[in-house]
A protein has these predicted regions:
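Membrane-embedded transmembrane-helix bundle of lipid-linked glycan/lipid transferases
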Residues: 1-402, 531-533, 539-562
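Intrinsically disordered, low-complexity segments enriched in small/polar residues
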Residues: 35, 60, 69-70, 76, 259, 410, 427, ...
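Solvent-exposed, flexible loop/coil residues
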Residues: 67, 150-151, 156-160, 345, ...
Length: 562
Protein backbone atom coordinates (compact mmCIF):
# COMPACT_ATOMS: atom_id res chain seq x y z
CA UNK A 1 0.00 0.00 0.00
CA UNK A 2 2.85 2.35 0.88
CA UNK A 3 4.53 1.55 -2.44
CA UNK A 4 1.30 2.37 -4.25
CA UNK A 5 0.98 5.70 -2.45
CA UNK A 6 4.60 6.45 -3.28
CA UNK A 7 3.89 5.89 -6.96
CA UNK A 8 0.57 7.76 -7.05
CA UNK A 9 2.11 11.20 -7.10
CA UNK A 10 0.66 14.02 -9.17
CA UNK A 11 3.60 13.80 -11.56
CA UNK A 12 3.33 10.04 -12.11
CA UNK A 13 -0.44 10.18 -12.58
CA UNK A 14 0.00 12.93 -15.20
CA UNK A 15 2.67 10.91 -17.01
CA UNK A 16 0.48 7.79 -17.01
CA UNK A 17 -2.54 9.69 -18.36
CA UNK A 18 -0.51 11.37 -21.12
CA UNK A 19 1.09 8.11 -22.24
CA UNK A 20 -2.28 6.35 -22.10
CA UNK A 21 -3.76 9.10 -24.28
CA UNK A 22 -0.87 8.69 -26.72
CA UNK A 23 -1.46 4.94 -26.89
CA UNK A 24 -5.20 5.31 -27.46
CA UNK A 25 -4.86 8.16 -29.97
CA UNK A 26 -2.35 6.20 -32.04
CA UNK A 27 -4.80 3.27 -32.16
CA UNK A 28 -8.03 5.24 -32.50
CA UNK A 29 -8.28 4.47 -36.21
CA UNK A 30 -9.39 0.88 -35.47
CA UNK A 31 -12.07 1.54 -32.87
CA UNK A 32 -14.73 0.87 -35.52
CA UNK A 33 -13.30 -0.94 -38.54
CA UNK A 34 -9.79 -1.81 -39.68
CA UNK A 35 -8.61 -0.21 -42.91
CA UNK A 36 -7.56 -2.57 -45.68
CA UNK A 37 -3.98 -1.36 -45.89
CA UNK A 38 -1.23 -2.69 -48.12
CA UNK A 39 -0.31 -5.64 -45.89
CA UNK A 40 -3.33 -5.93 -43.59
CA UNK A 41 -4.62 -9.13 -45.19
CA UNK A 42 -1.07 -10.45 -45.46
CA UNK A 43 -0.40 -10.32 -41.72
CA UNK A 44 -3.86 -11.54 -40.80
CA UNK A 45 -3.10 -14.43 -43.14
CA UNK A 46 0.03 -15.13 -41.10
CA UNK A 47 -2.12 -15.53 -37.99
CA UNK A 48 -4.50 -17.85 -39.84
CA UNK A 49 -1.61 -19.82 -41.38
CA UNK A 50 0.08 -20.40 -38.01
CA UNK A 51 -3.22 -21.46 -36.43
CA UNK A 52 -3.95 -23.88 -39.28
CA UNK A 53 -0.46 -25.37 -38.92
CA UNK A 54 -0.95 -25.87 -35.18
CA UNK A 55 -4.29 -27.58 -35.77
CA UNK A 56 -2.56 -29.91 -38.24
CA UNK A 57 -0.01 -30.84 -35.54
CA UNK A 58 2.88 -28.63 -36.68
CA UNK A 59 3.83 -26.61 -33.60
CA UNK A 60 6.90 -24.97 -35.16
CA UNK A 61 4.81 -23.74 -38.10
CA UNK A 62 7.80 -22.87 -40.26
CA UNK A 63 5.57 -23.65 -43.25
CA UNK A 64 2.16 -22.04 -42.87
CA UNK A 65 -0.82 -24.09 -43.94
CA UNK A 66 -2.61 -21.66 -46.23
CA UNK A 67 -5.96 -21.81 -47.98
CA UNK A 68 -4.50 -23.31 -51.17
CA UNK A 69 -3.15 -26.22 -49.15
CA UNK A 70 0.24 -25.91 -50.85
CA UNK A 71 2.02 -24.48 -47.79
CA UNK A 72 3.98 -21.23 -47.68
CA UNK A 73 7.36 -20.95 -45.91
CA UNK A 74 6.56 -17.71 -44.13
CA UNK A 75 7.86 -18.94 -40.77
CA UNK A 76 11.41 -19.33 -42.07
CA UNK A 77 11.71 -15.66 -43.03
CA UNK A 78 9.17 -13.94 -40.80
CA UNK A 79 9.53 -15.09 -37.19
CA UNK A 80 6.36 -16.47 -35.63
CA UNK A 81 7.38 -15.28 -32.15
CA UNK A 82 5.21 -12.18 -31.91
CA UNK A 83 2.33 -13.87 -33.70
CA UNK A 84 2.01 -16.60 -31.06
CA UNK A 85 -0.44 -14.73 -28.82
CA UNK A 86 -2.63 -13.49 -31.72
CA UNK A 87 -2.67 -17.02 -33.13
CA UNK A 88 -3.71 -18.47 -29.76
CA UNK A 89 -6.55 -15.96 -29.51
CA UNK A 90 -7.67 -16.81 -33.04
CA UNK A 91 -7.47 -20.54 -32.37
CA UNK A 92 -9.66 -20.05 -29.28
CA UNK A 93 -12.37 -18.68 -31.55
CA UNK A 94 -11.84 -14.93 -31.45
CA UNK A 95 -12.70 -12.98 -34.60
CA UNK A 96 -9.58 -12.32 -36.71
CA UNK A 97 -10.36 -8.59 -36.92
CA UNK A 98 -10.59 -8.33 -33.12
CA UNK A 99 -7.37 -10.33 -32.77
CA UNK A 100 -5.58 -7.88 -35.05
CA UNK A 101 -6.95 -4.90 -33.09
CA UNK A 102 -5.69 -6.37 -29.81
CA UNK A 103 -2.30 -7.02 -31.38
CA UNK A 104 -1.96 -3.42 -32.63
CA UNK A 105 -3.04 -2.02 -29.26
CA UNK A 106 -0.43 -4.16 -27.49
CA UNK A 107 2.21 -2.90 -29.93
CA UNK A 108 1.26 0.70 -29.12
CA UNK A 109 1.52 0.04 -25.38
CA UNK A 110 4.93 -1.61 -25.79
CA UNK A 111 6.13 1.24 -28.04
CA UNK A 112 5.28 3.96 -25.53
CA UNK A 113 6.96 1.96 -22.73
CA UNK A 114 10.27 1.29 -24.52
CA UNK A 115 10.69 4.89 -25.68
CA UNK A 116 9.89 6.15 -22.18
CA UNK A 117 12.52 3.82 -20.69
CA UNK A 118 15.07 4.78 -23.34
CA UNK A 119 14.79 8.56 -22.92
CA UNK A 120 14.41 8.32 -19.13
CA UNK A 121 17.72 6.46 -18.78
CA UNK A 122 19.55 8.80 -21.14
CA UNK A 123 18.19 12.12 -19.86
CA UNK A 124 17.34 11.12 -16.26
CA UNK A 125 14.16 13.15 -16.76
CA UNK A 126 10.56 11.89 -16.58
CA UNK A 127 9.49 15.06 -18.38
CA UNK A 128 11.78 14.38 -21.33
CA UNK A 129 10.80 10.71 -21.38
CA UNK A 130 7.08 11.52 -21.43
CA UNK A 131 7.40 13.93 -24.36
CA UNK A 132 9.63 11.53 -26.30
CA UNK A 133 7.30 8.57 -25.76
CA UNK A 134 4.21 10.59 -26.69
CA UNK A 135 5.75 12.04 -29.87
CA UNK A 136 7.22 8.70 -30.92
CA UNK A 137 4.00 6.74 -30.46
CA UNK A 138 1.91 9.35 -32.27
CA UNK A 139 4.39 10.40 -34.97
CA UNK A 140 2.80 10.58 -38.41
CA UNK A 141 4.95 7.89 -40.00
CA UNK A 142 3.85 5.38 -37.36
CA UNK A 143 0.21 6.36 -37.92
CA UNK A 144 0.62 5.95 -41.69
CA UNK A 145 2.29 2.58 -41.12
CA UNK A 146 -0.57 1.46 -38.89
CA UNK A 147 -3.41 2.72 -41.08
CA UNK A 148 -2.26 2.50 -44.70
CA UNK A 149 0.84 0.36 -44.95
CA UNK A 150 0.08 -2.20 -42.21
CA UNK A 151 3.74 -3.25 -42.27
CA UNK A 152 3.68 -5.27 -39.04
CA UNK A 153 7.45 -5.75 -39.16
CA UNK A 154 7.91 -1.97 -38.93
CA UNK A 155 5.17 -1.67 -36.30
CA UNK A 156 7.06 -4.17 -34.13
CA UNK A 157 10.38 -2.48 -34.91
CA UNK A 158 9.07 0.72 -33.35
CA UNK A 159 9.13 -1.21 -30.06
CA UNK A 160 12.73 -2.41 -30.18
CA UNK A 161 14.65 0.40 -31.88
CA UNK A 162 14.60 2.56 -28.70
CA UNK A 163 16.19 -0.37 -26.83
CA UNK A 164 18.92 -0.72 -29.45
CA UNK A 165 19.64 3.02 -29.24
CA UNK A 166 19.69 2.84 -25.44
CA UNK A 167 22.01 -0.16 -25.65
CA UNK A 168 24.37 1.77 -27.92
CA UNK A 169 24.28 4.73 -25.53
CA UNK A 170 25.09 2.57 -22.50
CA UNK A 171 27.88 0.65 -24.22
CA UNK A 172 29.56 3.71 -25.76
CA UNK A 173 28.92 6.51 -23.29
CA UNK A 174 27.80 5.18 -19.93
CA UNK A 175 27.34 1.86 -18.08
CA UNK A 176 28.85 -1.11 -19.93
CA UNK A 177 27.20 -3.48 -17.44
CA UNK A 178 23.90 -2.75 -19.18
CA UNK A 179 25.03 -4.38 -22.41
CA UNK A 180 22.05 -6.76 -22.16
CA UNK A 181 19.72 -3.93 -23.27
CA UNK A 182 21.42 -4.05 -26.68
CA UNK A 183 20.79 -7.81 -26.74
CA UNK A 184 17.08 -7.46 -25.99
CA UNK A 185 16.72 -4.83 -28.70
CA UNK A 186 18.33 -6.96 -31.39
CA UNK A 187 16.58 -10.18 -30.38
CA UNK A 188 13.30 -8.29 -30.64
CA UNK A 189 13.96 -6.65 -33.99
CA UNK A 190 15.40 -9.83 -35.53
CA UNK A 191 12.14 -11.58 -34.68
CA UNK A 192 10.18 -8.62 -36.04
CA UNK A 193 11.58 -7.87 -39.48
CA UNK A 194 14.78 -8.85 -41.30
CA UNK A 195 15.03 -5.60 -43.26
CA UNK A 196 14.73 -3.46 -40.13
CA UNK A 197 17.36 -5.70 -38.50
CA UNK A 198 19.69 -5.02 -41.41
CA UNK A 199 19.09 -1.26 -41.13
CA UNK A 200 19.81 -1.25 -37.39
CA UNK A 201 22.99 -3.28 -37.93
CA UNK A 202 24.22 -0.59 -40.34
CA UNK A 203 23.29 2.19 -37.91
CA UNK A 204 24.97 0.37 -35.00
CA UNK A 205 28.08 -0.18 -37.12
CA UNK A 206 28.28 3.56 -37.87
CA UNK A 207 28.01 4.36 -34.14
CA UNK A 208 30.74 1.83 -33.36
CA UNK A 209 33.07 3.10 -36.11
CA UNK A 210 32.61 6.71 -35.00
CA UNK A 211 33.63 5.71 -31.47
CA UNK A 212 36.07 2.92 -32.33
CA UNK A 213 39.03 4.43 -30.46
CA UNK A 214 37.01 4.78 -27.28
CA UNK A 215 35.68 1.22 -27.58
CA UNK A 216 39.10 -0.33 -28.24
CA UNK A 217 40.72 1.56 -25.35
CA UNK A 218 38.04 0.45 -22.90
CA UNK A 219 38.01 -3.35 -22.86
CA UNK A 220 34.74 -3.30 -20.92
CA UNK A 221 32.96 -1.61 -23.81
CA UNK A 222 34.45 -3.97 -26.38
CA UNK A 223 33.54 -7.01 -24.28
CA UNK A 224 30.06 -5.59 -23.82
CA UNK A 225 29.47 -5.40 -27.57
CA UNK A 226 30.82 -8.92 -28.06
CA UNK A 227 28.69 -10.38 -25.26
CA UNK A 228 25.58 -8.56 -26.46
CA UNK A 229 26.03 -9.73 -30.05
CA UNK A 230 26.81 -13.36 -29.20
CA UNK A 231 23.92 -13.63 -26.75
CA UNK A 232 21.49 -12.11 -29.27
CA UNK A 233 22.56 -14.71 -31.85
CA UNK A 234 22.23 -17.59 -29.37
CA UNK A 235 18.79 -16.56 -28.14
CA UNK A 236 17.56 -16.06 -31.73
CA UNK A 237 19.16 -19.24 -33.09
CA UNK A 238 15.77 -20.91 -33.40
CA UNK A 239 14.86 -18.36 -36.06
CA UNK A 240 17.99 -17.48 -38.04
CA UNK A 241 19.61 -20.95 -38.25
CA UNK A 242 16.65 -22.64 -40.02
CA UNK A 243 16.34 -19.58 -42.27
CA UNK A 244 19.98 -19.76 -43.37
CA UNK A 245 19.64 -23.50 -43.92
CA UNK A 246 16.72 -22.91 -46.28
CA UNK A 247 18.61 -20.20 -48.16
CA UNK A 248 21.53 -22.59 -48.67
CA UNK A 249 19.49 -25.66 -49.56
CA UNK A 250 16.65 -24.13 -51.58
CA UNK A 251 15.98 -21.39 -54.11
CA UNK A 252 13.10 -18.95 -53.81
CA UNK A 253 11.01 -16.52 -55.78
CA UNK A 254 12.63 -13.73 -53.73
CA UNK A 255 15.47 -13.52 -56.26
CA UNK A 256 12.96 -12.23 -58.80
CA UNK A 257 10.99 -10.38 -56.15
CA UNK A 258 13.96 -8.21 -55.21
CA UNK A 259 13.93 -6.78 -58.72
CA UNK A 260 10.46 -5.40 -58.03
CA UNK A 261 11.83 -2.84 -55.59
CA UNK A 262 13.75 0.28 -56.54
CA UNK A 263 14.34 2.94 -53.87
CA UNK A 264 14.47 5.61 -56.59
CA UNK A 265 10.75 5.04 -57.16
CA UNK A 266 9.85 6.11 -53.64
CA UNK A 267 12.06 9.13 -52.91
CA UNK A 268 10.74 12.37 -51.39
CA UNK A 269 11.36 15.97 -52.19
CA UNK A 270 13.27 17.79 -49.46
CA UNK A 271 10.18 19.82 -48.59
CA UNK A 272 8.13 16.69 -47.83
CA UNK A 273 10.52 15.28 -45.24
CA UNK A 274 8.52 16.72 -42.35
CA UNK A 275 5.13 16.93 -44.05
CA UNK A 276 3.62 13.96 -42.26
CA UNK A 277 0.42 13.67 -44.30
CA UNK A 278 -0.57 11.20 -47.00
CA UNK A 279 -0.91 12.46 -50.55
CA UNK A 280 -3.52 11.30 -53.01
CA UNK A 281 -2.52 8.97 -55.81
CA UNK A 282 -2.13 5.31 -56.66
CA UNK A 283 1.28 4.86 -55.04
CA UNK A 284 0.83 4.44 -51.28
CA UNK A 285 4.16 2.96 -50.24
CA UNK A 286 6.55 5.96 -50.27
CA UNK A 287 7.61 7.86 -47.17
CA UNK A 288 5.67 10.92 -46.13
CA UNK A 289 7.77 12.61 -43.49
CA UNK A 290 7.62 12.57 -39.70
CA UNK A 291 5.60 15.65 -38.88
CA UNK A 292 6.47 19.33 -38.67
CA UNK A 293 6.71 19.35 -34.87
CA UNK A 294 10.09 17.59 -34.89
CA UNK A 295 11.84 20.26 -36.94
CA UNK A 296 10.39 23.03 -34.73
CA UNK A 297 11.69 21.38 -31.56
CA UNK A 298 15.06 20.64 -33.19
CA UNK A 299 15.49 24.35 -34.00
CA UNK A 300 14.87 25.16 -30.31
CA UNK A 301 18.12 23.31 -29.55
CA UNK A 302 19.93 26.50 -30.55
CA UNK A 303 18.45 28.27 -27.52
CA UNK A 304 20.09 25.89 -25.02
CA UNK A 305 23.54 26.73 -23.63
CA UNK A 306 25.92 25.57 -20.91
CA UNK A 307 24.04 22.42 -19.97
CA UNK A 308 25.22 18.85 -19.35
CA UNK A 309 27.76 18.42 -22.15
CA UNK A 310 27.47 14.63 -22.34
CA UNK A 311 23.67 14.60 -22.48
CA UNK A 312 23.57 17.42 -25.02
CA UNK A 313 26.17 15.60 -27.06
CA UNK A 314 23.87 12.61 -27.44
CA UNK A 315 20.97 14.96 -28.17
CA UNK A 316 22.98 16.50 -31.01
CA UNK A 317 24.03 13.06 -32.23
CA UNK A 318 20.36 12.03 -32.31
CA UNK A 319 19.39 15.09 -34.36
CA UNK A 320 22.25 14.49 -36.78
CA UNK A 321 21.40 10.79 -37.12
CA UNK A 322 17.75 11.63 -37.76
CA UNK A 323 18.62 14.20 -40.43
CA UNK A 324 21.03 11.84 -42.21
CA UNK A 325 18.39 9.09 -42.26
CA UNK A 326 15.81 11.48 -43.69
CA UNK A 327 18.24 12.70 -46.36
CA UNK A 328 18.64 9.07 -47.43
CA UNK A 329 15.01 9.26 -48.56
CA UNK A 330 15.73 12.05 -51.02
CA UNK A 331 17.47 12.23 -54.40
CA UNK A 332 20.57 13.55 -52.61
CA UNK A 333 21.43 9.99 -51.56
CA UNK A 334 23.11 7.95 -54.35
CA UNK A 335 20.63 5.05 -54.47
CA UNK A 336 21.24 4.50 -58.18
CA UNK A 337 24.76 3.30 -57.32
CA UNK A 338 23.54 1.09 -54.46
CA UNK A 339 21.00 -1.10 -56.24
CA UNK A 340 21.76 -4.23 -54.20
CA UNK A 341 21.37 -2.41 -50.90
CA UNK A 342 18.25 -0.68 -52.18
CA UNK A 343 16.71 -3.98 -53.27
CA UNK A 344 17.27 -5.41 -49.80
CA UNK A 345 15.64 -2.57 -47.86
CA UNK A 346 12.91 -2.25 -50.54
CA UNK A 347 11.56 1.15 -49.44
CA UNK A 348 13.68 4.07 -48.15
CA UNK A 349 10.68 4.94 -45.97
CA UNK A 350 11.79 2.18 -43.58
CA UNK A 351 14.54 4.56 -42.48
CA UNK A 352 11.85 6.76 -40.96
CA UNK A 353 11.42 4.32 -38.07
CA UNK A 354 14.92 4.89 -36.59
CA UNK A 355 14.72 8.55 -37.69
CA UNK A 356 11.53 8.93 -35.65
CA UNK A 357 13.25 7.34 -32.66
CA UNK A 358 16.26 9.67 -32.82
CA UNK A 359 14.13 12.80 -33.28
CA UNK A 360 11.80 11.77 -30.45
CA UNK A 361 14.70 11.26 -28.03
CA UNK A 362 16.22 14.60 -29.02
CA UNK A 363 12.84 16.37 -28.77
CA UNK A 364 12.26 15.17 -25.23
CA UNK A 365 15.76 16.20 -24.15
CA UNK A 366 15.51 19.64 -25.78
CA UNK A 367 12.18 20.36 -24.09
CA UNK A 368 13.64 19.23 -20.76
CA UNK A 369 16.78 21.37 -20.88
CA UNK A 370 14.96 24.34 -22.40
CA UNK A 371 12.40 24.50 -19.58
CA UNK A 372 14.44 23.21 -16.64
CA UNK A 373 13.65 25.28 -13.52
CA UNK A 374 10.95 27.13 -15.51
CA UNK A 375 7.79 25.44 -14.27
CA UNK A 376 5.24 27.58 -16.11
CA UNK A 377 7.10 27.42 -19.44
CA UNK A 378 7.49 23.66 -18.97
CA UNK A 379 3.74 23.20 -18.57
CA UNK A 380 2.95 25.46 -21.52
CA UNK A 381 5.28 23.60 -23.90
CA UNK A 382 4.01 20.27 -22.60
CA UNK A 383 0.40 21.32 -23.22
CA UNK A 384 1.11 22.72 -26.68
CA UNK A 385 2.83 19.50 -27.77
CA UNK A 386 -0.01 17.30 -26.51
CA UNK A 387 -2.81 19.39 -28.05
CA UNK A 388 -1.00 19.90 -31.37
CA UNK A 389 -0.08 16.25 -31.73
CA UNK A 390 -3.58 14.98 -30.94
CA UNK A 391 -5.01 17.27 -33.62
CA UNK A 392 -2.30 16.27 -36.07
CA UNK A 393 -2.97 12.55 -35.54
CA UNK A 394 -6.60 13.00 -36.57
CA UNK A 395 -5.49 15.02 -39.62
CA UNK A 396 -3.05 12.26 -40.53
CA UNK A 397 -5.70 9.55 -40.17
CA UNK A 398 -8.07 11.57 -42.38
CA UNK A 399 -5.36 11.95 -45.04
CA UNK A 400 -4.77 8.18 -44.87
CA UNK A 401 -8.46 7.48 -45.36
CA UNK A 402 -8.64 9.88 -48.32
CA UNK A 403 -5.61 8.20 -49.90
CA UNK A 404 -7.14 4.74 -49.46
CA UNK A 405 -10.41 5.88 -51.02
CA UNK A 406 -8.46 7.37 -53.95
CA UNK A 407 -6.57 4.15 -54.54
CA UNK A 408 -9.53 1.83 -53.92
CA UNK A 409 -10.48 1.50 -57.60
CA UNK A 410 -6.83 1.02 -58.55
CA UNK A 411 -6.54 -1.94 -56.19
CA UNK A 412 -9.88 -3.43 -57.16
CA UNK A 413 -11.29 -3.32 -53.63
CA UNK A 414 -14.94 -3.15 -52.63
CA UNK A 415 -14.19 -1.08 -49.54
CA UNK A 416 -11.39 0.73 -47.75
CA UNK A 417 -12.10 -1.55 -44.79
CA UNK A 418 -11.25 -5.21 -44.37
CA UNK A 419 -13.70 -7.84 -43.12
CA UNK A 420 -13.20 -11.30 -41.69
CA UNK A 421 -13.93 -12.94 -45.05
CA UNK A 422 -10.84 -11.49 -46.74
CA UNK A 423 -8.92 -13.75 -49.10
CA UNK A 424 -5.70 -15.39 -47.94
CA UNK A 425 -2.83 -13.17 -49.04
CA UNK A 426 0.83 -14.08 -49.59
CA UNK A 427 1.77 -10.55 -50.68
CA UNK A 428 4.49 -10.65 -53.36
CA UNK A 429 5.07 -14.38 -52.91
CA UNK A 430 8.79 -13.91 -52.25
CA UNK A 431 9.05 -17.09 -50.18
CA UNK A 432 7.57 -19.36 -52.82
CA UNK A 433 10.00 -21.92 -54.25
CA UNK A 434 11.62 -20.79 -57.46
CA UNK A 435 9.56 -21.85 -60.46
CA UNK A 436 6.25 -21.85 -58.63
CA UNK A 437 3.47 -21.03 -61.06
CA UNK A 438 0.94 -19.32 -58.83
CA UNK A 439 -2.64 -19.02 -59.98
CA UNK A 440 -2.96 -15.57 -58.49
CA UNK A 441 -4.69 -12.26 -58.54
CA UNK A 442 -3.73 -8.88 -57.22
CA UNK A 443 -4.93 -8.21 -53.69
CA UNK A 444 -3.39 -5.27 -51.81
CA UNK A 445 -0.43 -5.49 -54.18
CA UNK A 446 -0.10 -9.20 -53.31
CA UNK A 447 -0.79 -12.71 -54.50
CA UNK A 448 -3.71 -14.86 -53.47
CA UNK A 449 -3.45 -18.56 -54.20
CA UNK A 450 -6.52 -20.28 -55.55
CA UNK A 451 -7.36 -23.57 -53.84
CA UNK A 452 -6.54 -26.50 -56.09
CA UNK A 453 -5.48 -30.14 -55.79
CA UNK A 454 -3.37 -31.17 -58.73
CA UNK A 455 -1.61 -34.54 -58.76
CA UNK A 456 0.19 -35.78 -61.84
CA UNK A 457 2.59 -38.48 -63.00
CA UNK A 458 4.79 -39.08 -66.02
CA UNK A 459 3.62 -42.71 -66.23
CA UNK A 460 0.03 -43.11 -67.41
CA UNK A 461 0.15 -46.87 -66.72
CA UNK A 462 0.82 -46.33 -63.02
CA UNK A 463 -2.31 -46.22 -60.87
CA UNK A 464 -2.29 -44.31 -57.61
CA UNK A 465 -4.61 -43.08 -54.90
CA UNK A 466 -3.91 -40.31 -52.45
CA UNK A 467 -5.14 -38.88 -49.18
CA UNK A 468 -4.08 -35.45 -48.01
CA UNK A 469 -4.20 -34.09 -44.47
CA UNK A 470 -2.75 -30.61 -44.08
CA UNK A 471 0.78 -30.74 -45.48
CA UNK A 472 0.97 -34.54 -45.31
CA UNK A 473 0.12 -36.85 -48.20
CA UNK A 474 -0.30 -40.63 -48.28
CA UNK A 475 -0.01 -42.25 -51.70
CA UNK A 476 -0.79 -45.85 -52.62
CA UNK A 477 0.42 -46.91 -56.06
CA UNK A 478 0.49 -50.05 -58.21
CA UNK A 479 1.39 -51.26 -61.69
CA UNK A 480 4.59 -49.21 -61.90
CA UNK A 481 6.78 -50.85 -64.51
CA UNK A 482 9.03 -47.90 -65.29
CA UNK A 483 12.29 -46.91 -63.57
CA UNK A 484 11.88 -43.14 -63.65
CA UNK A 485 8.24 -42.85 -62.67
CA UNK A 486 7.39 -39.92 -60.46
CA UNK A 487 4.30 -38.39 -58.92
CA UNK A 488 3.91 -34.68 -58.24
CA UNK A 489 1.74 -33.63 -55.31
CA UNK A 490 0.13 -30.22 -54.60
CA UNK A 491 2.51 -29.13 -51.85
CA UNK A 492 5.31 -26.62 -52.42
CA UNK A 493 8.76 -28.10 -52.02
CA UNK A 494 10.99 -26.78 -49.24
CA UNK A 495 14.07 -28.42 -47.84
CA UNK A 496 13.04 -30.83 -45.09
CA UNK A 497 10.26 -32.73 -46.83
CA UNK A 498 10.76 -36.50 -46.92
CA UNK A 499 9.01 -39.43 -48.59
CA UNK A 500 9.09 -42.90 -47.07
CA UNK A 501 7.20 -46.15 -46.76
CA UNK A 502 5.56 -46.07 -43.31
CA UNK A 503 5.73 -49.88 -43.04
CA UNK A 504 9.42 -50.55 -43.72
CA UNK A 505 10.87 -46.98 -43.66
CA UNK A 506 12.08 -47.26 -47.25
CA UNK A 507 13.18 -43.82 -48.43
CA UNK A 508 12.07 -42.41 -51.76
CA UNK A 509 13.88 -39.72 -53.71
CA UNK A 510 12.20 -36.36 -53.44
CA UNK A 511 12.92 -33.09 -55.24
CA UNK A 512 11.33 -29.90 -56.53
CA UNK A 513 9.23 -30.59 -59.60
CA UNK A 514 7.36 -28.47 -62.09
CA UNK A 515 5.81 -25.31 -60.68
CA UNK A 516 7.83 -25.68 -57.47
CA UNK A 517 5.83 -28.59 -56.07
CA UNK A 518 7.08 -31.84 -54.51
CA UNK A 519 8.08 -34.59 -56.91
CA UNK A 520 8.59 -38.08 -55.50
CA UNK A 521 10.22 -40.89 -57.53
CA UNK A 522 8.84 -44.42 -57.24
CA UNK A 523 12.14 -45.85 -58.48
CA UNK A 524 12.02 -49.67 -58.82
CA UNK A 525 8.94 -50.21 -56.68
CA UNK A 526 6.08 -51.80 -58.61
CA UNK A 527 3.59 -51.05 -55.84
CA UNK A 528 3.62 -49.65 -52.37
CA UNK A 529 2.66 -46.86 -50.01
CA UNK A 530 4.43 -43.54 -49.63
CA UNK A 531 4.00 -40.99 -46.88
CA UNK A 532 5.18 -37.46 -47.66
CA UNK A 533 5.61 -35.05 -44.75
CA UNK A 534 7.85 -32.32 -43.40
CA UNK A 535 10.53 -33.64 -41.04
CA UNK A 536 12.37 -31.36 -38.63
CA UNK A 537 15.97 -31.09 -39.86
CA UNK A 538 19.09 -31.56 -37.75
CA UNK A 539 19.85 -27.84 -38.00
CA UNK A 540 16.34 -26.98 -36.80
CA UNK A 541 16.66 -29.35 -33.84
CA UNK A 542 20.07 -27.93 -32.98
CA UNK A 543 18.75 -24.36 -33.17
CA UNK A 544 15.92 -25.20 -30.76
CA UNK A 545 18.38 -26.75 -28.30
CA UNK A 546 20.69 -23.70 -28.52
CA UNK A 547 17.82 -21.28 -27.87
CA UNK A 548 16.38 -23.28 -24.96
CA UNK A 549 19.77 -23.89 -23.30
CA UNK A 550 20.66 -20.19 -23.67
CA UNK A 551 17.35 -19.08 -22.12
CA UNK A 552 17.80 -21.52 -19.23
CA UNK A 553 21.33 -20.22 -18.72
CA UNK A 554 20.03 -16.64 -18.61
CA UNK A 555 17.40 -17.58 -16.01
CA UNK A 556 20.02 -19.29 -13.83
CA UNK A 557 22.41 -16.32 -14.08
CA UNK A 558 19.64 -13.83 -13.23
CA UNK A 559 18.60 -15.86 -10.18
CA UNK A 560 22.19 -16.10 -8.96
CA UNK A 561 22.80 -12.38 -9.39
CA UNK A 562 19.54 -11.61 -7.57
Amino acid sequence: MNKLKKYLTKENITITIVLLVGTIISSVFMFKQVYNGIDTAYHMSRIIGITNSWKAGDLLAYIHLNTSGYGYAMGFFYSNLFMILPSILYMLGMNIILVYKIFILMCSIATVITMYICTKQISKSKYAATISAFLYTTCSYRIITLVVKAFVGEILSFIFIPLIILGLYQLIFEDTKKWWIFTIGFVGILNSNLVMTEIMIYISAVFVLCNIKKIIKDKGRLKGFIKATVLALLVSAMFWMPMIEQLIKSTFHMKDGMNMYRPTWWLLSFGDLFNGLMKLGTQITPAYGLGFIFIVIAILRLAIKNEDAQKLKFCDISILAGLVLLLCMTKFFPWKYLKTLGGMIQFPSRLEVPAAAFFSIASGMICHYLTEKKTILRRIIFGIIIIYQIGFVFMCIKSCEDALIEVELYRGLDSVYIDENFEYDICDGMYLPEGANVQSKLISHGRHEEKKDKYKTNNSECNFKYAKNGLKVNISFENNKEVNTYIEVPIYYYYGYVAENPENNTKYKIEKGDEGVIRVYLENSESGTIQIYYKTTIVQKLSIIITIVTLLGIIICVKKSA
